[in-house]
Design a protein with these regions (language model features):
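Conserved catalytic scaffold of divalent metal-dependent phosphoesterases
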Residues: 11, 90-115
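Polar/charged alpha-helical tracts
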Residues: 61-65, 79, 89, 93, ...
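Acidic/His-rich segments in extracytoplasmic proteins that coordinate ligands and/or metal ions
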Residues: 71-95
Length: 115
């Protein structure tokens, strides 16, 4: 079983790492500071929001779609410019809007991964 780990890519800073050569695998763990809930929930249509949307599409194609399962734990940046208790739902809603529902957020729960 291949489990990959990724953290601190900070998509909210509009700085895109190149994952196009990533081979994928069984499980991807996103270990925090991926993007802010405020940015992903945004309904803005300005240039920054459009660029962030483009990065999320690339994130899906170059990385998320290459894994059978994707789990995420929130870091501190996910909560920036959000109300702490709302962050998880804002991420879930934002991921759904960007066709990223495959990402399962772990928050005070666990998952067993079997080979």
């Amino acid at each position: 079983m291949k489990i990959s780990y990724l953290s601190d890519i900070h998509l909210e800073f509009l700085n895109w790492p190149d994952f196009s050569q990533e081979s994928g695998g069984d499980v991807l763990l996103l270990a925090g500071d991926i993007t802010t809930a405020a940015m992903i929930r945004s309904h803005r249509t300005d240039a920054v929001a459009r660029k962030h949307s483009k990065y999320l599409s690339k994130f899906k194609k170059d990385l998320i779609d290459k894994y059978d399962a994707v789990y995420m734990v929130m870091g501190n940046h996910e909560h920036y410019n959000s109300i702490f208790k709302n962050t998880k739902q804002e991420l879930i809603d934002g991921f759904a809007r960007h066709d990223l529902s495959k990402i399962r957020i772990l928050d005070n729960n666990t998952v067993k991964i079997y080979d």
